Amino acid sequence: MLDNKDIATPSRTRALLDKYGFNFKKSLGQNFLIDVNIINNIIDASDIDAQTGVIEIGPGMGSLTEQLARHAKRVLAFEIDQRLIPVLNDTLSPYDNVTVINEDILKANIKEAVENHLQDCEKIMVVANLPYYITTPILLNLMQQDIPIDGYVVMMQKEVGERLNAEIGSKAYGSLSIVVQYYTETSKVLTVPKSVFMPPPNVDSIVVKLMQRTEPLVTVDNEEAFFKLAKAAFAQRRKTINNNYQNYFKDGKQHKEVIIQWLEQAGIDPRRRGETLSIQDFAKLYEEKKKFPQLEN
């Protein structure tokens, strides 16, 4: 049974909008959750407990934040919209374990904030209804920094979530799948209808769970170069990797035979398309490329 303090209801959200004269900014992708059942599903999937520190991005009016505060040891929330800070100060006033930072998550010193506010937590989870227009940059920024994050349970546009969780050979499988699955084990939690948001977004949503691997799926000496090589295989999805790499490498057209030799020595048929290659296949290509100095980009 809901208590009257839950923010994630249409009536409470409307009351807060009226109280603060708040208007949604489309440019910030603001869609507030108004269904506590969805929030409870997110909390359950997160496996957070009294020793967990949580990073939240885009808390809005605090509908998810208050539930996180009830379950976690500490919550560190980043909110870019200055107009929401007094709202959050109001709605989260009963909780002394929440810190709200009024900064752009892509510009904030997250590592320093975690060290300052979550240092006594046994594990750290990212739990958020992410701004859909910058979901990918946010996740990659967090994954590629030296921050001790154990996992992510995040809401995002369904199409993007399916790409993160895509299997080899599927239409959704691409370079984003490779980067995210390199760092994490991915799974789908639930699909979320538009009706549980205010205002309703134009796209369907999904909650995905990404648990940090103790070691990356493959070992490479330069992650950035590895990801660039993998991304090039998807430049034109209908083309073979042979064609895509001819376009990717400097003077690739003049090195057709070298590219074929490189692919074959890595055990990869040049006629295959990028979506048929596993992360392990791309790691073989990356290592084998070191034997071919002609292949520059």
UniProtKB/Swiss-Prot annotation:
Belongs to the class I-like SAM-binding methyltransferase superfamily. rRNA adenine N(6)-methyltransferase family. RsmA subfamily. Keywords: Cytoplasm, Methyltransferase, RNA-binding, rRNA processing, S-adenosyl-L-methionine, Transferase. Its main location: cytoplasm. It is found in: Cytoplasm. InterPro entries: KsgA/Erm, rRNA_Ade_diMease-like_C, rRNA_Ade_Mease_Trfase_CS, rRNA_Ade_methylase_Trfase_N, rRNA_adenine_dimethylase, SAM-dependent_MTases_sf. The gene is rsmA. S-adenosyl-L-methionine binds at N31, L33, G58, E79, D104, N129. Specifically dimethylates two adjacent adenosines (A1518 and A1519) in the loop of a conserved hairpin near the 3'-end of 16S rRNA in the 30S particle. May play a critical role in biogenesis of 30S subunits. This is Ribosomal RNA small subunit methyltransferase A. HAMAP family: 16SrRNA_methyltr_A (MF_00607). PROSITE patterns: RRNA_A_DIMETH (PS01131), SAM_RNA_A_N6_MT (PS51689). One of its GO terms (molecular function) is RNA binding. SMART domains: rADc. It holds the Pfam family RrnaAD. It comes from Staphylococcus aureus (strain MRSA252). It catalyses: adenosine(1518)/adenosine(1519) in 16S rRNA + 4 S-adenosyl-L-methionine = N(6)-dimethyladenosine(1518)/N(6)-dimethyladenosine(1519) in 16S rRNA + 4 S-adenosyl-L-homocysteine + 4 H(+). GO terms for cellular component: cytosol. Its EC number is 2.1.1.182.
